[in-house]
Swiss-Prot record:
Name of the gene: RABA1F
Function field: Intracellular vesicle trafficking and protein transport.
SMART domains according to UniProt: RAB, RAN, RAS, RHO
Lipid-acceptor residues (S-geranylgeranyl cysteine): C214, C215
The species this protein was found in: Arabidopsis thaliana (Mouse-ear cress)
Family of this protein: Belongs to the small GTPase superfamily. Rab family.
Protein name, entry field: Ras-related protein RABA1f
Length: 217
């Protein structure tokens, strides 16, 4: 039980959702970040799945509760409960399948319809290790991210490329917005109740953060 107690020591709890077409590698991104595991035999997720991991941002412990779409995206059955309370999202496409890139606009609309307008979004081009099969250029994806005012990275869950960076960037940006908002109203950010749904502030707060931008390495 000690391990469970240790895992509960955190200053913030942020809910982050993974969205995107089936087969783009969402579950492997989740397992790579939370358990440093990758499965070549990965089957479509069935049933609700989420995992947690805590990271340090400044001198605070930020715990991420990361939700996987559980295969429901194949049936267009993702419910509003999946999105409820999310303050961050990774919108994933497969760089080798152009149709998954074409569908991100629909995913983004659904995400924004069901979440706070200021949610921190990372646009993720996964399977970047399959260079010889690339069907979506980095430039096209960057242009989309800039147009939609989101962050962007290309990742490889297989090679563990940028997976850590993508998740930690989202969590760090959420933390910065929440911290700045707390300072503006004179609150101690650490005093916010654990598990509270975090309102990530006014539109100006997040657009100012997002202008910093982020791109693939």
């Amino acid at each position: 039980m000690a391990a469970y107690r240790a895992d509960d020591e955190y200053d913030y709890l942020f809910k982050v959702v993974l969205i995107g077409d089936s087969g783009v590698g969402k579950s492997n991104l989740l397992s790579r970040f939370t358990r440093n595991e990758f499965s070549l035999e990965s089957k479509s997720t069935i049933g609700v799945e989420f995992a947690t991991r805590s990271i340090h941002v400044d001198d605070k412990i930020v715990k991420a509760q990361i939700w996987d779409t559980a295969g429901q995206e194949r049936y267009r059955a993702i419910t509003s409960a999946y999105y409820r309370g999310a303050v961050g999202a990774l919108l994933v496409y497969d760089v080798t399948r152009h149709v998954t890139f074409e569908n991100v606009e629909r995913w983004l609309k659904e995400l924004r319809d069901h979440t706070d307008a200021n949610i921190v979004i990372m646009f993720v081009g996964n399977k970047a290790d399959l260079r010889h099969l690339r069907a979506v250029s980095t430039e096209d994806a960057k242009a989309f991210a800039e147009r939609e005012n989101t962050f962007f990275m290309e990742t490889s869950a297989l090679e563990s490329m940028n997976v850590e960076n993508a998740f930690t960037e989202v969590l760090s940006q959420i933390y910065r917005v929440v911290s700045r908002k707390a300072l503006d109203i004179g609150d101690d950010p650490a005093a916010l109740p654990k598990g509270q749904t975090i309102n990530v502030g006014s539109k100006d707060d997040v657009s100012a953060v997002k202008k910093v931008g982020c791109c693939s390495n």
